[in-house]
Each structure stands twice: as C-alpha cells, then as structure tokens.
Amino acid sequence: MTPFPPPLSGSAQDETPELRPRFDENGLIAAIAQDAGTGEVLMLAWMNAEALQKTIETGRATYWSRSRGALWVKGETSGHTQEVIELRVDCDQDAVLLKVRQTGGACHTHRESCFYRRIEGGVLSFTGKAD
C-alpha cells in the first residue's frame, strides 16, 4: 500500500498542491538525479512508493533496483552518495527530479554521470572518463 494519495484525473493532477505520484503498472516512477550545483544530469533510476517516501524522510537518494527487486540507498556500499538538496515532480507527477550533492561517481562505471556517451551521426563517442 502506498503512503501517497492516488493521482487525480486530467488537469486536476497538473494543478494539485498535494504530492500524488503517478506510479506505473509496476508501481514505479522514473527518477532523474541532477547535480544541484552544475545542473548536469547524473543518472536515471526508478523509485517505488517506499523508495520515494524514504528519500523524503532521510534526504538520501533511495531507489528501487529492478534487477535485485530491492530498495537501494545510493552509495550504501560504494560510498558514492547522493544528498538530496531539492526534490521535484513533473506536471502530471509521473517523474521525479532529485537535485543532489553527489559524492564520488554517480555511475556504476565510476564516472561522474551515467550519460558519458554522445551519439553523433549514429556513432557513440565517450565524453567522460572513469575514476
């Protein structure tokens, strides 16, 4: 059971002052982590209701690992933590933006960002180095 009220219909969802996340059919919501200082997009992950609630309560980015089927506190094992500075939802509340203070690399490859490859003319080029 989710700790959040259900989403509203139509434009009422766009204008409500209440947090009413719209989780998908798997109970998940997209979560984008962005560096609060630079604005760089760091990663895309997923949250279920429990992960979102824990993030709100603790100020530490907590995600849902689809591969492990378990909660994942960013940096719990790697030390590469995300302190949440600001938390936002998009217009219809089906995506979350976490503005974070990142310690260490955000990517499991030890890069600052998971978005370290640029597509140019259908070819990938690397933009970031692993630590």
UniProtKB/Swiss-Prot annotation:
GO biological process, one term: L-histidine biosynthetic process
UniProt keyword list: Amino-acid biosynthesis, Cytoplasm, Histidine biosynthesis, Hydrolase, Magnesium, Metal-binding, Zinc
Main subcellular location of this protein, as a coarse class: cytoplasm
Pathway it works in: Amino-acid biosynthesis; L-histidine biosynthesis; L-histidine from 5-phospho-alpha-D-ribose 1-diphosphate: step 3/9
Catalytic activity: 1-(5-phospho-beta-D-ribosyl)-5'-AMP + H2O = 1-(5-phospho-beta-D-ribosyl)-5-[(5-phospho-beta-D-ribosylamino)methylideneamino]imidazole-4-carboxamide
Subcellular location: Cytoplasm
Signal sequence, renumbered to the chain: none
Pfam families: PRA-CH
Binding site for Zn(2+): C91, C107, C114
Cofactor annotation remark: Binds 1 Mg(2+) ion per subunit. Binds 1 zinc ion per subunit.
Cofactor(s), by name: Mg(2+); Zn(2+)
Binding site for Mg(2+): D90, D92, D94
Enzyme class: hydrolase
Database matches in InterPro entries: PRA-CH (IPR026660), PRib_AMP_CycHydrolase_dom (IPR002496), PRib_AMP_CycHydrolase_sf (IPR038019)
Annotated function: Catalyzes the hydrolysis of the adenine ring of phosphoribosyl-AMP.
Family: Belongs to the PRA-CH family.
Name of protein: Phosphoribosyl-AMP cyclohydrolase
Organism phylogeny: Bacteria, Pseudomonadati, Pseudomonadota, Alphaproteobacteria, Hyphomonadales
